[in-house]
Regions:
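Intrinsically disordered, low-complexity terminal regions
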Residues: 2-291
């Protein structure tokens, strides 16, 4: 019996190593062992309708950049390119594979557009952007699978970042009127610099939120109700700050603000080196407020 169970464990472990990504496409599944960009020898420009959002469900990297003209370019082999579905529905460019098993997939997708409102990845594929993206209206970036989103500088009226799975989001800089970021899974959010009016971050999962530099002309809010931590390294907030922990996650804040309302009802601490005018500190759990 022990030998049989050991063989079964080895078999299952080998199977997990052989399949790095499984994507539910609604009426079936896409199973991918390994996706690489090595061996690309075929390029196909897709004719698609106008879009202002991208929904990425491919198991590969999608490279997005801002340009005067809209273009969707599939770079692969001729065989694999034929399996890639690119369709626009209600202004959203949807990227997905035909149902099947792909032990080795050679693929990447390059997209340009003059403007964009939403970038979302739903599977194991990443979205990569470099440089500066100037959006006319609001921008939402979201990952709900294991895929990551990595972006450069962003200028928008309002900016929203959401991580609902294990995927991470890393952004070099954001300049917007309103800034909102939330985590409800195990993925981490990392921002190097944020310049905004209103600022709000929250985590309800195990993922962390980190921000190196913040300048907020209005009020700022940080809430942790899971096990994830929130770290705000260097902040300048002209308005008030509201800091709340109701779980085991900690909030660390360094910088200056007007007044502070800090409350912990769980085991998480609120700490840091923060200069302020007045503080209303409350603690009803094992967590402490030390600012």
């Amino acid at each position: 019996m022990k030998r049989t169970m050991k063989k079964l464990f080895v078999f299952l472990a080998a199977g997990l190593l052989a399949v790095s990504c499984i994507i539910n496409i609604g009426n079936g599944f896409v199973s991918v062992g390994n996706c690489t960009e090595e061996g690309i020898d075929y390029t196909e420009v897709r004719e698609v309708g106008a879009f202002n959002a991208i929904s990425h469900s491919l198991p590969c990297k999608v490279y997005f950049s801002q340009a005067d003209q809209q273009e969707v370019r599939v770079e692969s082999t001729e065989e694999f390119a034929a399996k890639v579905i690119t369709v626009v529905e209600d202004g959203t460019l949807k990227l997905k594979m035909e149902e099947g098993r792909y032990p080795k997939l050679i693929l990447r997708v390059v997209i340009t557009s003059p403007d964009i409102e939403s970038l979302q990845t739903h599977g194991c594929g990443d979205i990569i952007h470099k440089g500066t993206l100037r959006v006319k209206g609001d921008l939402t970036v979201k990952t709900s699978g294991s895929g990551d989103i990595r972006m450069g500088m962003i200028e928008a009226k309002a900016f929203t970042a959401q991580s609902r799975g294990s995927g991470d989001i890393r952004i070099e800089g954001v300049s917007s009127a309103n800034f909102s970021a939330s985590v409800s899974g195990s993925g981490d959010l990392n921002f190097v610099r944020v310049d905004c009016a209103g600022f709000k971050v929250s985590t309800t999962g195990s993922g962390d939120i980190s921000l190196s530099n913040l300048t907020a002309k209005g009020n700022a809010e940080a809430r942790s109700s899971g096990s994830g931590d929130i770290r705000l390294s260097e902040i300048t907030v002209d308005g008030d700050m509201e800091l709340r922990t109701t779980g085991s996650g900690d909030i660390t804040v360094n910088g200056t603000c007007h007044d502070v309302m800090a409350s912990t009802t769980g085991s998480g601490d609120i700490s840091g080196n923060l200069s302020f005018g007045h503080i209303d500190a409350r603690s009803s759990g094992s967590g402490r407020v030390r600012l």
